Every structure is written in structure tokens, then in C-alpha cells.
Curated annotation (Swiss-Prot):
UniProt family annotation: Belongs to the ABC transporter superfamily. AI-2 autoinducer porter (TC 3.A.1.2.8) family.
Protein name: Autoinducer 2 import ATP-binding protein LsrA
Subunit structure: The complex is composed of two ATP-binding proteins (LsrA), two transmembrane proteins (LsrC and LsrD) and a solute-binding protein (LsrB).
PROSITE patterns in the cross-refs: ABC_TRANSPORTER_1, ABC_TRANSPORTER_2
UniProt subcellular location: Cell inner membrane
Topology in membrane: Peripheral membrane protein
Gene3D superfamilies: P-loop containing nucleotide triphosphate hydrolases (3.40.50.300)
A Pfam family hit: ABC_tran
Keyword line: ATP-binding, Cell inner membrane, Cell membrane, Membrane, Nucleotide-binding, Repeat, Translocase, Transport
Chief location: membrane
Top-rank taxon: Bacteria
Enzyme class, spelled out: translocase
GO CC annotation terms, alphabetical: plasma membrane
The species this protein was found in: Photorhabdus luminescens
Amino acid sequence: MLHNNTAVPPLLEVSGISKQFSGVMVLKHIDFTLLPGQIHALLGGNGAGKSTLMKIIAGIEQPDKGILKISGHHVSHLNPTKAHQLGIYLIPQEPLLFPNLSVQENILFRLPKHQVDKSKMKQLLALLGCQLDLHVSASSLNVADQQLVEIMRGLMRNSKILILDEPTASLTPAETERLFTQLRELQQQGVGIIFISHKIPEIYQLAGQVSVMRDGSIALSGEIRDYTTDEIIQAITPVAKNQPLNGTQKLGLDLSNSPSQTASDRPILTVTKLSGEGFCNITFSVKPGEILGLAGVVGAGRTELAETLYGLRPAISGEIKLKQHSVNGLKTAQRLAQGLVYLPEDRQSSGLFLDSSLGWNICSLTHNRNTFWIRPAYDTAVLERYCQTLNIKFSHINQPIKTLSGGNQQKILIAKCLEAHPAVLIIDEPTRGVDVAARNDIYQLIRHIAQQQVAIIFISSDLDEVVRMADRVLVMHQGEINGELTKQQMDVDTIMHIAFGEHKPQQAASC
């Protein structure tokens, strides 16, 4: 590969880069190098500075200090247009598409005429295993398909430096492997790839080099084969880290509106022959205290089903019963008042008020429950409680949530759902964009909530996560439930086979 040629200068050379926001140092004298044909993994906890560093490289932010070189040439006053011209393309964690333009128009947007090659676009789609309709609007795509469109935009621009920020967060294992195949082909062509991920097994599978950021500095850097998983996790996690969560007592959760603490065999949520946009004839039930996994490939109908249960989409037919009473005729706010709470897949467009404060966001579902007036002091007290237990990093209490890192935004969204006192909690990709140090806390938190007899529907594209968390899993394929597995039956390989419709095992007895 090209990076074996020592005469070739680095594609990217960052020296002494520093950056601060509102007096807070977010980058401290960063050194980072990317060679041609190199896949360099970048890891770090939420708020470690990864996204800020990548925005500087992509020309979105300007450094306060330091030197940036592209292919051996010093570059200053970099902006996104100039970055694209230099072959730098950033694929963000949250897709930034034009919702009213078609998929094809988004891919080709602002592409120089000599690079507009529709046959190449179709070939790349085939290599990625994508079944995207190029003529539908981007607003109709789910998060995973939006991410694939962003990846296509970068590939169509013949980028020399490709930055991928959590590209597999909403992809299934099969889709992830197809992406990795394409990235390896780009690597052979001399493209340098910066790969940001919280999934350490992916890093060992794909990358040759690794750098770990912590508190705005580089804590570890070198060839990945020289480091163990434990060494990488230790570099990510500060030495003086918080103690593990100690049940809901430490959270101080008030689940008075939730079901009785006495375990019950009677389902709290029953769905019968439910059909809607993207799914049909869905029947299942979930009991208090049960974690019911919902797995399937992108486009299987999981998110559409969740949004229909919550009332965001209309049901075509079938019945939804919460606490033995039909909620078909209830609006979303009424279902919420009955204890049905939904944590959406796309936190920025559906879950959070980006210009509002952190405390206001956490309490936003309950502001009108007990009083007409908003109570800033109460919001602040709630914020402080969750920040201590979920290790949410922020500068000040009135800070807009849009200024937080992606992982910290996700933690605020989880806190918002918990503050609504759920009886049934539907969580769609709960650890998307959350670092390895925080995932275990979130897993533990979800289990503690289930132990208080809250029913949880757990939707995730990370099948290892589903196997780890779920008591039972329903596997969807093309809008239908293609299989059900008990805890003893489930493993990643079995779920994948069912998700792709290869076989349909005997249904479990309890449904």
C-alpha cells in the first residue's frame, strides 16, 4: 500500500492544535498524523474532543493554535469548500441531508460536473449492498439510510481523507461488514481514513493505527496490534472515574406512576394484529419488568412500529392495549400520561430541543403534568441529579443542549424519558454515539428500571447488545415478526439468520 513508501508525505499532519469554547479548553496541543492507505481509529469518551478535532480538519471550526498540513503543505483559514477541494470529507454522526431533495440530488449536491457519474454512483451503491431508491426524498429515509447517503457523498467526491464519525452506529452487522469491505478497497487505493467508533471490536477488525483522546488530549497513540482492549479502555476512562450506578436509589427516581413493584405475569402492553406503514400483522405482549428485544435489519419496520405504538404514526388496523385498556384512540400526550414513553432513534430531530437548556430538556415531558408554570429551580435540581449519576459533562446549567457532544446529548435524552415515570419504556438505539465507558452504566440503568417492574422494549442494531440485554427477542423481517427467541435460544448468528429471512424457528410459547 502507499503508506509503506516513506517518501510519500502524510496526507494529514496536525501539530499542537488547541481550541477553547467559552473559556473551556476542549483541545490541548493535539498531534495527529494520517498516512496514505491508512485506517486510523480515533476513540475517546463523550466530550473528549474528537468531534471538535475533526471539525477543525474539515474546516468547520478554526483552531486557536497549531499547524495543519495536507499532503505536506501548510493550510490556514480552512473552510468546508476548501477542504472538499483538498480531498477532505467528513461524514458526521448525525446525517446532514436536504430533506426535500431526492437521494440522488443529495449525493450529487455541489459535485463538480466532471465528477457527476451516475453509473459510478450505482456501482458504489451495489458494493455497499444498498437498496436505496435514488428518487425518493431524503426526509423519507430512516437514520441508517441517511448515514449511507452521507457515505456515498464522500465516496463520490474521490476523497483522499475520509472522516467517518460513528458510521456503524445504526447499521446491522451485515451492513457494517459491507461498509468495511468498501473501506478496505479505498485503503488499497491510498485513501486515508479516520474512523471514529465506540465499538472496540470494530477497531481491531478494521484499523491499523489507533489514537485515544481524553479530556482534550491524546492519551494513547500507535499501532493497534500493540495495545490490548483493556489498555484502550483504560486510556479512554479517567483514573478518577465515578463509581458504578447503585440502583435507582442513587438516581433518586420517583416511579410512583409506574406499575406496582410486585411482579406480575399479566402483560402490561398487548399488541394484536397491528398493521401500519412499514409493518403488518404484528402480535406480541410484554410484561412488567421484562426487557423485550426488537431486532432486524434496517428497513425491517422496527422504528415504524415503535412510533405507531407511541402514537406518532397512525395504525391501519389492529389493537394496542396498555394496562388492559385500548389506546388506539389516544393521542401521543395521552399515551404518555398513561405511562407509555418513547426514546427516539434520532435525538437531534425528534428527541431534544437543541436551543433549550439541559434542565429544560430533561423535564420537558413533565412540564405541564403538575403545574402550568415552568420551574427553573426544579429543572436545575433534576439536571444536577442526572448529571452526577450519568456523568453528563457541561459548562453551565443554561448551556444550550446543541453545544454538547453527541454522547452527552444521548444521556440527556435518556434522563428525559426516565423523568416521565414510564410504565412502558420504548428505547430505540439507546447507546447510539455513547462511549464504551458510559455504555455499561446505561445497560445497568436499564436493568434497574426493569427491576422496578417497568416493561422495556429494547430496539438496537447492535445484536451483541440485544443478546446481552434482552430477556426475549422478536426478530423482524420485511415488516413482519419472523421469529421469537427466548434468552436460552438467542445468539447473534441465530438472530441474523432470522433477520434476513433465511429460516423461521418455532415460536416461543409466551407471546
